Design a protein with these regions (language model features):
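Conserved ABC ATPase signature
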Residues: 46-50, 54-56
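Catalytic Walker B motif of ABC-type/P-loop ATPase nucleotide-binding domains
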Residues: 71-74
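Conserved catalytic motifs of ABC-family nucleotide-binding domains
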Residues: 67
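Short coil-to-helix segment of the ABC ATPase nucleotide-binding domain corresponding to the Q-loop/switch region
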Residues: 11-18
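Hydrophobic anchor residue at the start of the ABC signature
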Residues: 60
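Conserved ABC ATPase "signature" region
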Residues: 25-42
Length: 144
């Protein structure tokens, strides 16, 4: 999941997600993903009809519907409001717990580190610190 959404402008939200689901071996359920990211009401809209945060949630849905073993996220909640951020983080947490997806989140938001198993901090392109998180905070309880 990148900061640039790369949505296909001539496809609806649902079609943008289906493109990926159709080539995936074991995709997640479309309705579950749309509901979890609170974008089910936009399923027939085109990207140009969505806000930046809504477009970001569609891009996240495209990545998640594949049911990947590894999910790399660059500023996952960067364009999202607090409510949407929490929804996305709860769904990522569920993917990790329920489906065993390894999630790597690159972020400047220190609060998100609270839900991580391991926190790796970089400085000047080098690992400056690596910590195991002994007190994980559920996504629902993060102060974002």
């Amino acid at each position: 999941v990148f900061q640039f959404y790369n949505l296909i402008p001539d496809l609806t939200v649902e079609e943008n997600i289906e493109v990926v689901a159709d080539i995936s071996a074991h995709p997640l359920d479309m309705d579950e993903v749309l509901r979890a990211l609170d974008i089910e009401k936009y399923r027939r809209r085109f990207p140009k009809e969505l806000s930046g945060g809504q477009q970001q949630r569609v891009a996240i849905a495209r990545a998640m519907i594949k049911n990947p073993k590894l999910l790399l996220c660059d500023e996952l909640t960067g364009a999202l409001d607090t409510k949407s951020s929490r929804q996305v983080l709860k769904f990522v947490e569920k993917m990790n717990r329920q489906f065993g997806t390894t999630v790597v989140i690159i972020t400047h938001n220190e609060a998100i580190a609270g839900m991580a198993d391991q926190v790796i901090r970089l400085k000047d392109g080098q690992v400056s610190e690596s910590l195991l998180n002994q007190r994980k905070i559920p996504a629902a309880e993060l102060v974002l």
